């Protein structure tokens, strides 16, 4: 399954706006509050927060940098094993106070199950700073993201994750089928439900 995903990303790389990311820190929670690549000669900025998590296929991230800056570039990328895809954020996801701070709170970004880390390329006062965030995975097996959860488990070879996804998906489908059969077989019950939804 891993080779299939790698081949798919390779094909996507040849077609889409993907870039090669620099090598850097990959351990979760380690060195998240310092850049792994920076052209800044002196550390004139301070990273106050850099966190992210995946919730059923959606990426959420927040962070902040404090320092005397008058201009910035905020360029987040999804890291798919060293290959980065540009992530597009809304203007109101980033808050910039000139001379004081840059804060971001990115929500509901779609990422593929082979997502590894969030790479942030920041240009502050002309200095290029790279941050990396390894996401925490939050799973709700009762959500509608069954395929994403199943693919994530297959890519990570977490077969327990795949099994729980299949179990909850089967329960939901069974309940749906029982409800449809129960309502359509009993005509009186069908009319009652129709009146309920019409009114």
UniProtKB/Swiss-Prot annotation:
InterPro entries, per database record: Herpes_US2/US3, Ig_E-set
Domain (Ig-like H-type): residue spans on this chain: 43-137
Protein name: Unique short US2 glycoprotein
Residues that span the membrane, as ranges: 162-182
Protein family according to the UniProt entry: Belongs to the cytomegalovirus US2 family.
Segments on the Lumenal face: 1-161
Job of this protein: Participates in the inhibition of the host immune response. Early protein that redirects newly synthesized major histocompatibility complex (MHC) class I heavy chains via the SEC61 translocon to the cytosol where they undergo proteasome-dependent destruction. In consequence, infected cells are masked for immune recognition by cytotoxic T lymphocytes. Seems so far to be specific for HLA-A, HLA-B, and HFE loci products. Does not interact with HLA-DR or HLA-DM.
Domain remark from Swiss-Prot or TrEMBL: The lumenal domain allows tight interaction with class I molecules encoded by the HLA-A locus.
Subcellular location(s) of the protein: Host endoplasmic reticulum membrane
Recorded GO CC terms: host cell endoplasmic reticulum membrane; membrane
Paired cysteines (S-S): 52-133
Annotated keywords: Disulfide bond, Early protein, Glycoprotein, Host endoplasmic reticulum, Host membrane, Host-virus interaction, Immunoglobulin domain, Membrane, Signal, Transmembrane, Transmembrane helix, Viral immunoevasion
The UniProt record lists the keyword Ribosomal protein: no
Cytoplasmic side stretches: 183-199
């Amino acid at each position: 399954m891993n080779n299939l995903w790698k081949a798919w990303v390779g094909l996507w790389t040849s077609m889409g706006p993907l870039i090669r990311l620099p090598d850097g820190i990959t351990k979760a929670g380690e060195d998240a509050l310092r850049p792994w690549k920076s052209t800044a000669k002196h550390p004139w900025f301070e990273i106050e927060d850099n966190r992210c998590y995946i919730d059923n296929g959606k990426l959420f991230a927040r962070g902040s940098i404090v320092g005397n800056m008058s201009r910035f570039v905020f360029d987040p990328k999804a890291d798919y094993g060293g290959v980065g895809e540009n992530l597009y954020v809304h203007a109101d996801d980033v808050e910039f106070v000139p001379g004081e701070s840059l804060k971001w709170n990115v929500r509901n970004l779609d990422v593929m199950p082979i997502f590894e880390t969030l790479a942030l390329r920041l240009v502050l006062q002309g200095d290029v700073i790279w941050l990396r965030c390894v996401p925490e995975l939050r799973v709700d097996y009762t959500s509608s993201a069954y395929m994403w959860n199943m693919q994530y488990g297959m890519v990570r070879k977490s077969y327990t994750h795949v099994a729980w996804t299949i179990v909850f998906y089967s329960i939901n489908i069974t309940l749906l089928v029982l409800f449809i059969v129960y309502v359509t077989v009993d005509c009186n019950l069908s009319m009652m439900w129709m009146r309920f939804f019409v009114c």
